[in-house]
Amino acid sequence: MNCIGDIAHGLWTHPRDDSRAYRTSRYWAELARTLERGGFDTLFLADIIGANDVWEGRPDAALREGVQHPINDPLLLVPLMAHVTEHLGFGVTVNQSYEVPHLFARRMSTLDHLSEGRAAWNIVTGFLDSAARAAGQTQQLGHDARYDRADDFMALAYKLWEGSWEDDAVVHDRAARIHTRPDKVHRIRHEGPYYQADTIFLSEPSPQRTPVLFQAGASKRGMDFAARHAECIFVSGTKAQARETIADITARAVALGRRRADLRFFVGTIVVVGATEAEARERFAEYRHHASPEAGLAHFSAQTGIDFSRFDLDAPITNPDTQALKSFLESVTTRSGGQVWTPRRLLDQMVLGSRHTPIVGSAEQVADELESWVREADVDGFNLIRTVVPECFTDIVDLLVPELRARGVYKKAYTPGTLRHKLFGTDRLPDRHAAASFRFSPASA
């Protein structure tokens, strides 16, 4: 996130942390170069557009502790980081609930052009009532209705990206004074339940046309959405839970005519790696000392919509009243052998990364655990959560990456081409994807 802390809250107080420099171009340029040196596929930027104000019914804790606030726009970082790298992809979170499809599609096409095909979009529908109020609405749509609206948004975006301009529309013929052939640019007319448009798209086709699509919905409706639209999907929980989720989403995607090879699943985790196990555990203890349990629980309150400050710290949470809380408690209860959860235990769990289990140890130990996740959970990769910046990433690049490369389980060099080509071997979405039905064809003209 374009702020001082996103999930492992409070670590901005660590004396070696440089996240206060998030306001500078130097910070992001150095981070991008470090990740490319380590062969990372993508730098992922989460985002919110409202305040975490559920804890105690106000945003005070989030403001005091820097819980995703203040936060700057993530999209504007991409051209800067693309300029100092050649291969690193950039996944940017944008909440479609408050976007105009026509203008948003142009912004993403622009990023894809400027990055030479390295743009990705993490599709979210939002969870903060404060975001709805900030956008002039009294409240959010209901959970499933937000996904219904997102489906309509995607249909229009696909029409713009995939169906308005033919690949050979731009000829740039100086002698004939023809830059774009009008017969190769097609009007988009969309009359959906939430969005309407009558336009030709503003941007010529970018290297990927549609950016690589990320998504993280864990509900049944969210998994249906992922099965239809997403290419890269975030999962969480234990290995068994992640494997079950992956199998479920894959089955839904296959039912829509897609394949497992069309999908990449990433599990979120915190990695603390040292030259030895003792060094890593000492560093992990140091991180926990600087972390803020209250900040973590303020964040979790916003995610679930439940103000945990109202509860007795030692009273068991027996009847979770939101799906988000129910899913979280099922996840952590399985990991803890069925122990009862209280707000006090949640406070401890929230210190570093909430539902994301830290992996702590030497490079060999961490590599063993990552390989275990791939083997047992069927994940394709990892969404590594920052802790103390920049050392959390330089440690991974300098200690863990060489170990993974020595084992032959991590690339030694990048494959040339777009981000989608690096991940899937093709620049454009396959014909099996929902977007393909919106491509221009002479028969439909």
Ranges and model annotations:
Residues M1-A445:
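N-terminal glycine-rich cofactor-binding segment that shapes the pocket for flavin-like pterin cofactors
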